[in-house]
Amino acid sequence: MSSSAMPDVPAPLTNLQFKYTKIFINNEWHSSVSGKKFPVFNPATEEKLCEVEEGDKEDVDKAVKAARQAFQIGSPWRTMDASERGRLLNKLADLIERDRLLLATMEAMNGGKLFSNAYLMDLGGCIKTLRYCAGWADKIQGRTIPMDGNFFTYTRSEPVGVCGQIIPWNFPLLMFLWKIGPALSCGNTVVVKPAEQTPLTALHMGSLIKEAGFPPGVVNIVPGYGPTAGAAISSHMDVDKVAFTGSTEVGKLIKEAAGKSNLKRVSLELGGKSPCIVFADADLDNAVEFAHQGVFYHQGQCCIAASRLFVEESIYDEFVRRSVERAKKYVLGNPLTPGVSQGPQIDKEQYEKILDLIESGKKEGAKLECGGGPWGNKGYFIQPTVFSDVTDDMRIAKEEIFGPVQQIMKFKSLDDVIKRANNTFYGLSAGIFTNDIDKAITVSSALQSGTVWVNCYSVVSAQCPFGGFKMSGNGRELGEYGFHEYTEVKTVTIKISQKNS
């Protein structure tokens, strides 16, 4: 998230208690129907933090029923003034500000995030997103249409209905609010499934949603696993829309489930293998730092990671040298500890996948400049890794790594690099570094990406639409476009005795 004035960062909380570990339905806390629970871990220490109720199909059914009841015509939620919906969202933002330290500590412990990043960037982004969505609540409106004949025609922007929202583990709280903010602003009700790795901040949000004054059933939170709770949401006949952020593989399953059930609307924000192109005329210091942050931020666990770095031939060697020098500055360790600049990967599965891809880079002939292996005796830590002499056919140049691995490729001409940059199934984002405005406009127009950054990278804001081309998904989140995903347009035509201009 882009930010202006940054607050001071306090010390994280110690002896944090996890008060909310149950399923949240109708503004009440429930045990799972099955009686099952699942463990939640700290990826930096591999220690169990707590156990959370494991939602399944029966729990999703209960949540959807509550959401449907809250969405009925004449309900407190449906009859509420749009401006009052905005007031509730602003109240929720106030409560997040009050609990900012607690939530940031929880994100760092459960998600392996650097505490300072969680406090400044994640929580800062959460608050700004909610306030932006609150402002839109009474500005979502229809139009009158000058239809031929003696008719009066207007459109209504109505809420879609019950929205299933499936949240990823890399930005658990921020993505929770990217989902519920626009949905609630438009007047929908929601059933949210947080990622099984990182459910704790979402469950704390349940308590704040109730405290803010949202009517029962408007927001329901069902922690659980993707193949059970997630699949139940995607295939549910009484869910009108599902929004998902996560892998392309799972996105395909969700779209298939939607098609096989009630053809519910689907918006997807999926994987990426984003190109970042550095031309010889770029400000080299700026390009090195942005490209570095673009791939190493949050241990590389970002869908927009600048994971295909194309550098023009004449500056290639110097760029590699500076990039390696920058990567070697990291201090790995517990993300709650001051001075640490890289935390762990989220879990063992991701850790092993990243190490396997690093090994493939070595075997396929890329030059390992630094890193290249695990770090420490406890936790899922991987050394910051830089490869040079990478070719487009290598696995590390084609597959989404989702780890602290930078691969730097060489290019000679503008036409060549555009072709190579677009030679991927993905199309989420891209970066261009140049001081030539004509080149910047030409390349940004040619790239098949939902977002293109010029002389910067990973600059995301609630005011700007975000989403992908190709297999990086469909639909947009945030910005004015993001609200279209959560409304249906109804045309109303009334016969009148005489129309006048």
UniProtKB/Swiss-Prot annotation:
Positions of the region Mediates interaction with PRMT3? 336-501
Cite the annotated pathway: Cofactor metabolism; retinol metabolism
Q: Which reaction does it catalyse?
A: an aldehyde + NAD(+) + H2O = a carboxylate + NADH + 2 H(+); all-trans-retinal + NAD(+) + H2O = all-trans-retinoate + NADH + 2 H(+); 9-cis-retinal + NAD(+) + H2O = 9-cis-retinoate + NADH + 2 H(+); 11-cis-retinal + NAD(+) + H2O = 11-cis-retinoate + NADH + 2 H(+)
Name the EC number(s).
Answer: 1.2.1.19, 1.2.1.28, 1.2.1.3, 1.2.1.36
Q: Which residues carry this modification: N6-acetyllysine?
A: 91, 128, 252, 353, 367, 410, 419, 495
How is the protein altered post-translationally, as described in the entry? The N-terminus is blocked most probably by acetylation.
Modulation of this protein's activity: Inhibited by duocarmycin analogs.
Q: In this chain's numbering, which residues are marked as the site (Transition state stabilizer)?
A: 170
What's the top EC group for this one? oxidoreductase
Entry-annotated residues carrying Phosphoserine = 413
From the UniProt record, which GO molecular function terms apply? Answer: 3-deoxyglucosone dehydrogenase activity; acetaldehyde dehydrogenase (NAD+) activity; aldehyde dehydrogenase (NAD+) activity; aminobutyraldehyde dehydrogenase (NAD+) activity; benzaldehyde dehydrogenase (NAD+) activity; NAD binding; retinal dehydrogenase activity
Question: At which residues is Phosphothreonine found?
Answer: 337
Q: What is this protein called?
A: Aldehyde dehydrogenase 1A1
User: What does the organism's lineage look like at the top?
Assistant: Eukaryota, Metazoa, Chordata, Craniata, Vertebrata
Identify the coding gene.
ALDH1A1
